[in-house]
Amino acid sequence: MICFIILHYMVKEETIKCVESILEREMDNIQIIIVDNLSPNNSGQELFEYYKGNDIVDVLLNDENAGFASGNNVGYSYTKEKYNPDFMIIMNNDVELASENFDEKLREVYKKEKFFILGPDIYSTTYELHQSPKRLEHYTYQEVLSLHNKFNKSKEITLFLKLKSWLKSNDFLRTFVYQSRVKSKDIDFTKIYYNVPLHGSCVIYSKLFIDKEEFAFQPGTFFYYETEILDYICYKKEYKTMYSPELKVLHHQNVSTNVVYNNMLKKTIFANKCNYESTGVFLKVMESFQENGVDQ
């Protein structure tokens, strides 16, 4: 069985579109689990009513919004206990499957590779670029510490932060910056890569991971650095992870956060706060491995 876990927040139409992109593939033996992260506009309850009587779609109404990792972990735990699937595909509600015979290709890759985690080719329709893998190296402690200190300084509202927010509100400039970053990394998205940080908008977990791990993502973060932390944990535990261009999805980016934060300054402040907290969690994970080894 393949289970799709979709984290929902606010934008009902996008979640329905995501579900339809899965159902249109007419795959056998699948289940779709929608996790509503306590949407204040009642869209979670509306989805619950919309899919009532649909045996393929479960809608979970979370009693809090504790962010990306926590919401997905709720879906992961529920799915693991109820369905015990061969694969879990955790995806944003703004992601659509693009590959034909997605399930068959997934099983073929697994039969050959026996991976714990796989990241598909994720193409951002918003910025017209490939997003996974995010880079080709694991993060180091000094690198994360430097980021943590940088985000700590960025929590204050300064002239620089206002200027940065203004620049990010320009679609052309923002797209140019994102595309330039990707080009500078010199990643060939047509190649297979092993044990690299993957993009979090679509992550595929095999039974090898599911049988061993209680959580899909390290608890404690709200947004950002979830897959970077996951990459580090898998690296330390010697779990095989991979990027495969055989499986493709489309990412219509930032739909939920754009609904909540239509003001770019507020969105940037929120992002800096989350980045600071997430890098703090990342540092604690690294320190724990340094102190205790891999048996955690």
Please provide the spans of the model-predicted regions.
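A short, conserved alpha-helix in the catalytic core of glycosyltransferases
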Residues: 188-189, 196-215, 219-247
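A conserved acidic beta->alpha catalytic loop
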Residues: 21, 36-47, 64
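Active-site donor/metal-binding and catalytic loop motifs
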Residues: 242-262
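Short, acidic, metal-binding catalytic loop of nucleotide-sugar glycosyltransferases
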Residues: 21-30
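Glycine-rich, basic loop-to-helix element that forms the pyrophosphate-binding segment
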Residues: 63-82
